[in-house]
Amino acid sequence: MSPSFKHNCTNDHYVVEWASKQAAKADYIVTHYGDRFDIKFLQSRLLYHGLDPLPLPKCLDTWKMSRSTLKLHSNRLASIAAFIGAGNKTPLSGPIWIRAMSGHVPSINYVVKHCEQDVLVLEAVYNKLRRLDGCHPNVQVFYGKPDGCPRCGSEHLESKGYRATQLYVYQKF
């Protein structure tokens, strides 16, 4: 926790600066509804604090993956996670947020634990949905495995027939 946060719990400069540095190092950022909320929120806070805005990050958005490939009653992260068995989000009520924003340490700790669980659920959802994403980057490039799965990098491939284009026939895995 930064000293400025201990003095003023509404000062998010340290968190925003840290998040910006982490995002700038990443090739891709995995989010849920990130293009429509998280990235814009972070950009707004960076400008507010007089920090440089992020270069436009490449997002792998599980909300978009779900919305474009599944037909669910809701595309909220909790709904998708429950549907595919990817863990549970912790509940977070308005009163807890309000207490946390006023500096109530137990509420702040609860929000931190909630966010950590959120990341674990997001990771599990992403790992399941990325197989459905036709625009997912080829992870073989990152793993250096030219004969691996382009979506997860696994070398344990199972042939699933062939796919034809106008010019070529490709084996499906």
Tell me the role of every PLM-derived stretch.
Residues 2-79, 83:
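Conserved DEDDh/DEDDy metal-dependent 3′-5′ exonuclease domain
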Residues 42, 100, 168-169:
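Short Asp/Glu-rich motifs
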Residues 142-145, 170:
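Residue-level signal for mature regions of secreted extracellular proteins and peptides
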Residues 149-152, 170-173:
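Short cysteine-rich clusters marking metal-coordination/redox-active sites
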Residues 154-159:
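Short functional micro-motifs and their immediate structural scaffolds
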